[in-house]
């Protein structure tokens, strides 16, 4: 298949590899993005194990807690400027309070629910759109529960560009729970621990690392041992409890949590717009459109 400039650009953003290396990888793999990433990693060109999802949409995340229930949500806007608007800030708080109190199963159900004044949530958002002048979207939310013996860890980074909600079980130390949430915001682990990683993902990583070691010219008899060592680093990159704790590099997150007498069973991390591609207009066309709009 034809390799387009957009495909090369996407692969560069996901791997940090050079343009010519990306083009070759896509050519060798017939345009398969995932196989091209593996190709670059096997050659030692792309070092990142995690794919970097493009973050393009604007908006905020928000966290609301009430007793033993907590909620995290993401509300999208078209521009960062609107996300700082007082009307937008008020809307996200109203939505959070409603969602936590009424506990809809999903966004579709939430939009049909009645909010104050007899309006549906969808109508309430549409009224805000009319006032603010931009499309606003309730993208996602999740409700988390705990017991009296647990603590919520809630953290909003950069005013809500990233939001993390977690539960420290068996401990009521809210400061410790928040420290873990801050770590999750900064490091972005994919899983809580190694047990959560699928066998397929581990085997895929083992194959990539094996080919990488062979391409480096390592003797076959030591490749297996090298691969197991590199797999350990792979787990440290993606598993929260295996990671070095950002607030104390002398201990792992697991050790920090255990020192507080608690356990960590899961977490929710939202980054605004992750996985959403924003339409890319040609800059000259954008200027012309603005000029025409002012006529």
Curated annotation (Swiss-Prot):
Pfam families: EF_TS (PF00889). Keywords: Cytoplasm, Elongation factor, Protein biosynthesis. It is found in: Cytoplasm. One of its GO terms (molecular function) is translation elongation factor activity. SUPFAM superfamilies: Elongation factor Ts (EF-Ts), dimerisation domain, UBA-like. Its main location: cytoplasm. The keyword Protein biosynthesis applies. Gene3D superfamilies: 1.10.286.20, DNA helicase RuvA subunit, C-terminal domain, Elongation factor Ts, dimerisation domain. GO terms for cellular component: cytoplasm. Residues 79-82 are annotated as: Involved in Mg(2+) ion dislocation from EF-Tu. Associates with the EF-Tu.GDP complex and induces the exchange of GDP to GTP. It remains bound to the aminoacyl-tRNA.EF-Tu.GTP complex up to the GTP hydrolysis stage on the ribosome. NCBIfam families: tsf (TIGR00116). Belongs to the EF-Ts family. HAMAP family: EF_Ts. This is Elongation factor Ts. The lineage of its organism: Bacteria, Bacillati, Bacillota, Bacilli, Bacillales. The gene is tsf.
């Amino acid at each position: 298949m034809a390799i387009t400039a957009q495909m090369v650009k996407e692969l560069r953003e996901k791997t940090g590899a050079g343009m010519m290396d990306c083009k070759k990888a896509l050519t060798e793999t017939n345009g398969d993005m995932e196989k091209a990433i593996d190709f670059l990693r096997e050659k030692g060109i792309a070092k990142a194990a995690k794919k970097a999802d493009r973050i393009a949409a604007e908006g905020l995340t928000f966290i609301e807690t009430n007793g033993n229930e907590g909620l995290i949500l993401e509300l999208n806007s078209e521009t960062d400027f609107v996300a700082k608007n007082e009307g937008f800030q008020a809307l996200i708080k109203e939505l959070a309070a409603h969602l936590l109190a009424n506990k809809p199963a999903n966004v579709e159900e939430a939009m049909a629910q009645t909010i104050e004044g007899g309006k549906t949530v969808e109508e309430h958002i549409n009224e805000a759109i009319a006032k603010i002048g931009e499309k606003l979207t309730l993208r996602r939310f999740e409700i988390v529960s705990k017991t009296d013996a647990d603590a919520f860890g809630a953290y909003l980074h950069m005013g809500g560009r990233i939001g993390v909600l977690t539960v420290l079980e068996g401990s009521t130390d809210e400061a410790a729970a928040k420290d873990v949430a801050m770590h999750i915001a900064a490091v972005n682990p994919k899983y809580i621990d190694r047990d959560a990683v699928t066998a397929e993902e581990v085997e895929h990583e083992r194959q990539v690392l094996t080919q990488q070691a062979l391409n480096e010219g390592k003797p076959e008899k030591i490749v297996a041992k090298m691969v197991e060592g590199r797999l350990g680093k792979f787990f440290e990159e993606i598993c929260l409890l295996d990671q070095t704790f950002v607030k104390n590099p002398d201990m792992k997150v697991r050790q920090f949590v255990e020192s507080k007498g608690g356990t960590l069973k899961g977490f929710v991390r939202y980054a605004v717009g992750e996985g959403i591609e924003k339409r890319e207009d040609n800059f000259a066309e954008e200027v012309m459109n603005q000029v025409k709009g002012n006529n």
